[in-house]
Swiss-Prot record:
Domain PUA: 275-355
Major localisation: cytoplasm
Listed GO biological process terms: L-proline biosynthetic process
Lineage top rank: taxon: Bacteria
Gene from which the chain derives: proB
Family affiliation: Belongs to the glutamate 5-kinase family.
The protein's name: Glutamate 5-kinase
Purpose of the protein: Catalyzes the transfer of a phosphate group to glutamate to form L-glutamate 5-phosphate.
Native source species: Streptococcus pneumoniae (strain 70585)
Cellular compartments annotated: Cytoplasm
NCBIfam families membership: proB
EC numbers for this chain: 2.7.2.11
């Protein structure tokens, strides 16, 4: 089979009734498709929204709450109810499910990242279906992933999935908003995610949930840069998950990079927090960005920040001011300053295995639109 390990992301609009409450029939349909794929030999992960939708009614709210505390309380109640729906339906087919609640810190902190990866690997190898959501009940803004589109891409990259599928109420990426523009056409295959694609996504988003088309495209960048292809398709068809796995569903397919980022490079590119800045000369800039070389001390022009040995810093081309990438340093700021002052600096500040160049595609992730 072409796609053995698949991550499915199901959004709020694919799980709810018109009044915003959880649709048990929609949950049942999703679990039936998961069961069929599981029985066919696929390894599956489900990133599911819907905790607030499942819980707000049980707390006596007439409609989906808008206050943060009310939403967190609803999620606390609803996460258990939502998992119960999934678990009950899957157990009817003798399939074990597992709940994993994550925050951004589980990706930023290397130890927690490794632990999450190991837990997911064991679950998949033992035939369980992990059901993942952000830990909405306790997470604060500083630790939020922000949306399940991004979370699903981070998970797909972490487990080196063969495919990431976004199930939504829009059957792919269009050149315009298909609800208002009769000339809008769906893009069936996207080779590169660039500014033009980002602009298209801004006009073709879903209005439900927290993740519209723009967040899906930015999430697709994380996945495709990590070697995971992405499929955006409609959740409205009864067999959409099965057809997506078989490549027979209508939608938009995003091609993965042939040489996807390894786990260490993923962490550097998407999660590592920079503790300082380094400016380099033209020769060092070319060595890093064009030739895949390590950063030698002799190419450093200037350093800024109170970083220590092993910290991550951002490197800039002094001449152009352009950000070149991020890497792990072999010397702290004080030691580096002493060596640069002596004008006899020799050795390596950042080895190439501890370096990630910031490509135009990755740069788009950190651009506000």
């Amino acid at each position: 089979m072409k796609y053995k390990r698949i991550v499915f992301k199901v959004g709020t609009s694919s799980l709810t009734n018109e009044d915003g409450s959880l649709s048990r029939s929609k949950v049942k349909d999703i679990t039936q498709q998961l069961a069929m794929l599981h029985e066919a030999g696929h390894e599956l992960i489900l990133v599911s929204s819907g905790a607030i939708a499942a819980g707000f009614g049980a707390l006596g709210f007439k409609k989906r709450p808008t206050k943060i505390a009310d939403k967190q309380a609803s999620a606390a109640v609803g996460q258990g109810l939502l998992l119960e729906e999934y678990t009950t339906n899957l157990l009817l087919r003798q399939i074990v499910s597992a709940q994993i609640l994550l925050t951004q810190d589980d990706f930023v902190d290397k130890r927690r990242y490794k632990n999450a990866h190991q837990a997911l690997s064991v679950l998949l190898n033992r035939g369980a279906i992990p059901i993942i959501n952000e830990n909405d009940s306790v997470v604060i803004d500083e630790l939020k992933v922000g949306d399940n589109d991004t979370l699903s891409a981070q998970v797909a990259a972490m487990v080196q999935a063969d495919l990431l599928v976004f199930l939504t109420d829009v059957d792919g990426l269009y050149t315009g908003n298909p609800n208002s523009d009769p000339r809008a056409k769906r893009l069936e295959r996207i080779e590169t995610i660039n500014r033009e694609i980002i602009d298209m996504a801004g006009g073709a988003g879903s209005s439900n949930g927290t993740g519209g088309m723009l967040t899906k495209i930015k999430a697709a960048t994380i996945a495709t840069e990590s070697g995971v292809p992405v499929y955006i398709c409609s959740s409205l068809k009864s067999d959409s998950m099965i057809e997506a796995a078989e490549e027979t569903e209508d939608g938009s397919y995003f091609v993965a990079q042939e040489k996807g980022l390894r786990t260490q490079k993923q962490w550097l590119a998407f999660y590592a927090q920079s503790q300082g800045s380094i400016w380099v000369d033209k020769g060092a800039a070319e060595a890093l960005s064009q030739h895949g070389k390590s950063l030698l001390l002799s190419g450093i022009v200037e350093a800024e920040g109170a970083f220590s040995y092993g910290d991550i810093v951002t490197v800039f081309d002094k001449e152009s001011g352009k950000s070149l990438g991020k890497g792990r340093v072999q010397f702290g700021a004080s030691a580096l300053e002493d060596m640069l002052r002596s004008q006899k600096a020799k050795g390596v500040l950042i080895y190439r295995d501890d370096w990630i160049s910031i490509t135009p595609e990755i740069q788009l992730l950190f651009t506000e639109f």
